[in-house]
């Protein structure tokens, strides 16, 4: 096959091997196996996962061994709870400083208040989303702006990750967040799979907020499973275990207009394949290989078409 030249910086999250949201999935994988497979497939970056050391020198040495960079880490926050805001910002600063020490330029932030699975104030059996009040939105925005200033002090950018099962999930909520936040402070992490899950056409979202997107997560969606999840109102973890997400090229999302727009934008941030599945069902190496080959092939064809 003709070798493709991909101008994008493509990484992959360890969640394909070891799941951070669902304990027990992929526990048998070691960081050496995961990193070696990433490197073998041509990925150049990853994100923080629970299988990696949290000691910067140790992690840096391990990543360097395989020629992999750390792109960022998902940081769950409770900025919507005004009573916890100061403590949350202290915790955020410690993680931001950690990422800075690791050479990262981005901090991924997601509000956990009111979420299905990740709000520590709620009981585990509470699997509905508790939507934010106006005052909670105000606190969230305040926290994001202050956290973004911390990032700026460190030469980093804050990117907000809208996410299924959280209070910034739907098209209306994503638009509200973008409207309420300062575009010079709060940037957007564009996630194709979570956009579709939340009812936002991924192409429309990309075009609408192209000037605010600084980080990309690529995942695909199995349409039949998404319909089942909506019909039966399944919670997020159950949806993942049912196989709602998969890698780009294996689901119903059309990535041609997405990559065409990224090329038009001269996008130069990270693109991370982040497609959580049960590794016992979807073999991580096989699916990571499938994703990389699909992306390389698609980008090659789009760039070749430009030259005609």
Curated annotation (Swiss-Prot):
Keyword Manganese in annotation: yes
Gene3D superfamilies noted in UniProt: Divalent-metal-dependent TIM barrel enzymes
Keywords associated with the record: Cobalt, Lyase, Manganese
EC number: 4.2.1.44
Cleavable signal peptide: none
Pfam families for the chain: AP_endonuc_2
UniProt xrefs under SUPFAM superfamilies: Xylose isomerase-like (SSF51658)
Transmembrane residue ranges: none
BP-aspect Gene Ontology terms: inositol catabolic process
Metabolic or biological pathway: Polyol metabolism; myo-inositol degradation into acetyl-CoA; acetyl-CoA from myo-inositol: step 2/7
GO molecular function: manganese ion binding; myo-inosose-2 dehydratase activity
Chemical reaction(s) catalysed: scyllo-inosose = 3D-3,5/4-trihydroxycyclohexane-1,2-dione + H2O
Cofactor: glutathione; Co(2+); Mn(2+)
Similarity comment text for this entry: Belongs to the IolE/MocC family.
Name this protein carries in UniProt: Inosose dehydratase
Species of the source: Geobacillus kaustophilus (strain HTA426)
Highest classification ranks of the organism: Bacteria, Bacillati, Bacillota, Bacilli, Bacillales
């Amino acid at each position: 096959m003709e070798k493709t030249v991909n101008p994008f910086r493509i990484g992959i999250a360890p969640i394909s091997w070891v799941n951070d949201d669902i304990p027990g999935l992929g526990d048998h994988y070691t960081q050496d196996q995961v990193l070696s497979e990433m490197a073998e497939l041509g990925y150049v970056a990853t994100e923080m996962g629970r299988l990696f050391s949290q000691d910067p020198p140790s992690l840096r040495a391990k990543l360097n061994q395989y020629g992999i960079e750390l792109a960022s880490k998902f940081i769950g926050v409770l900025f919507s709870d005004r009573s916890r805001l100061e403590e949350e910002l202290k915790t955020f600063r410690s993680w931001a400083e950690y990422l800075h020490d690791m050479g990262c330029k981005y901090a991924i932030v997601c509000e956990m208040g009111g979420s299905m699975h990740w709000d520590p104030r709620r009981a585990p059996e509470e699997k509905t989303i508790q939507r934010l009040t106006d005052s909670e939105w105000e606190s969230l925005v305040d926290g994001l702006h202050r956290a973004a200033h911390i990032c700026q002090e460190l030469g980093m950018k804050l990117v907000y990750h809208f996410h299924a099962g959280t209070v910034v999930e739907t098209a209306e909520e994503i638009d509200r967040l973008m409207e309420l936040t300062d575009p010079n402070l709060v940037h957007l992490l564009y996630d194709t799979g979570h956009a579709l899950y939340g009812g936002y056409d991924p192409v429309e979202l990309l075009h609408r907020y192209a000037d605010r997107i600084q980080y990309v997560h690529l995942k695909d969606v199995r349409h039949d499973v998404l319909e089942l999840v909506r019909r039966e109102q399944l919670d997020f973890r159950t949806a993942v275990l049912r196989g709602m997400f998969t890698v780009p090229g294996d689901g119903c999302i059309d990535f041609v207009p997405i990559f065409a727009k990224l090329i038009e934008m001269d996008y130069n941030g990270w693109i991370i394949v982040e497609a959580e599945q049960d590794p016992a069902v979807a073999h991580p190496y096989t699916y990571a290989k499938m994703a990389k080959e699909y992306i390389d092939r698609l980008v090659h064809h789009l760039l070749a078409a430009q030259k005609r």
